[in-house]
Amino acid sequence: MSKKKLSKLLALYLPYVVIGLLATNLGEAWRLAAGKELGDKIVSLMDTLPAAFSNPLPSLRPFDLFIGLCCGAGMRLAVYLKGKNAKKYRHGMEYGSARWGTPKDIEPFMAPKFADNIILTKTERLMMSNRPPDPKNARNKNVLVVGGSGSGKTRFFIKPNLLQCDSKNFPVSFVVTDPKGSIGVECGEALLKHGYKLKFFNTINFSKSMRYNPMAYIHSEKDVLKLVTALMTNTKGEGQGGDPFWDKAERLLLVSLIAYLHYEAPVEEQNFATLLEMLNTMQVSEDDETYQNPVDLLFEDLGKKKPKSFAVRQYKLYKLAAGKTAKSILISCGARLAPFDIQEVRDATMYDELELDKLGDRKTALFLIMSDTDSTFNFLISMIYTQLFNLLCDKADDQYGGKLPVHVRCLIDECANIGQIPQLEKLVATIRSREISACLVLQTRSQLKAIYKDNADTIVGNMDSQIFLGGSEPTTLKELSEALGKETIDSYNNSDTRGNSPSYGTNYQKLGHELMSRDELAVLDGGKCILQLRGVRPFLSDKYDLTQHPNYKYTSDYDPKNALDIEKFLNRKEKIHPDDTFIMVDADSLPPA
């Protein structure tokens, strides 16, 4: 038994032991009292009590000890029954116990070293470690940030956490959604100074972008299905519904074609440009069911060589459609893949430079630049996130025993604009153990519900940290006010009656009041924010001052000379270092092509 438990038991039962020992003297007095009748005993007891208690030591006679035991146990039983039947009062908390958090509340969740934390507010931080000294203080690193336009989501949350790039104990890779293309410019040099490898994918100007080929990350039949699901989920268009038959038919065709490219085509042809070329050659004859286009012949030949091929099996299911139906399916597929027909997009997806599967191996910062006014190419960003989560989870499980060596933090600004990430509600619940975290940044909570419907609550429930930077959207204010709870306040009412019989009185009562009502949240000071951390009282704090960050001096906000020229950075030539290793190949000895 621990010393703490022993001390607690002694403090609880020692008084009753003392009472029992004293009561042994009462037993001695009763034993010494003369008389056989009860009345005579009681009269004589008055004479023997002084003599019995004159000796401070307890009596050890069996009868006396029995009396002492009964008295001690009886007193303990009486106290227990009184406590059990007592009325339960919560003074000062009759209508609610809500209050604001204090520095003492957040202290167990913060790492001593500033660089080893996620910055939440000016005074509150969350340790990067998933294994704190006390396991009860473990929290996932998923964060939900809600703030209206101009509330400082980028300045007060994304930039400060991007500058947390100098931790030696907990190295971090970043994946940053950059709606305006400014974050990489302003913070890129700071990351380079701390040994980061920078990558950019730009859907606003593809000529200033690195290449991203979704097919480069296909390693199995499951990956083909995941890619097609991500593509179709984010190219639905607004307000589309109708018969699911067409979606299922399109899925069969796309899966079969992509599987064919992956398993049969040369690596340089495994891209969407080749996929479109295949679709363009798939003419269908409505009158002649025996007509075969070039793609039909490819699959027929493959079926003879590999009859159990995944691509062949899927294509045979597609070919069950009649000529007219098949033509409609082809038209739907062509419309869905129309963005890949643009030459810039073809070039940007021809091969891959992003190396998504290596984000957890070394310190890397990937900036995903997208338009916040035109969502035409945002589906590419969503596909990147979908593949990224799946690739990193698989790599953590298969190569690193379930935990990546470098934590990958996704700072997803304007989360509602990138489209739907398939299975996000499941991913946010499982990525924590793999050293991956997602920080969703929204203008209102209703944006999340509009995209993820009933799964929005599941996503929010897996965000252990939630920050409100300000806003006026009614649903957000209502939900936050209810989550903060009610506190108990004191109310005085003065009454003054005038007339022939004037009277004056004061009435005191307790009332329940929201910690912050909706109207108070709507006029929240621009420099304040509200932090909710699971299992802890909410905090009303100042927003983090970016200028106070130790790495602020490396940003272009501090000195315009620190601005990173992305185009120049992408076009730079790799420098050869003295310790680089090369393989020398004699070109004359190579076999002819």
Task: Name the predicted role of every residue range.
Residues 4, 72, 247, 514, ...:
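General helical secondary-structure elements
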Residues 110-111, 126-132, 236-245, 267, ...:
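Low-complexity, polar-biased intrinsically disordered regions enriched in Pro/Ser/Thr/Gly
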Residues 428-530:
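Conserved ATP-driven motor cores of ASCE-family P-loop NTPases powering translocation/secretion/packaging/pilus
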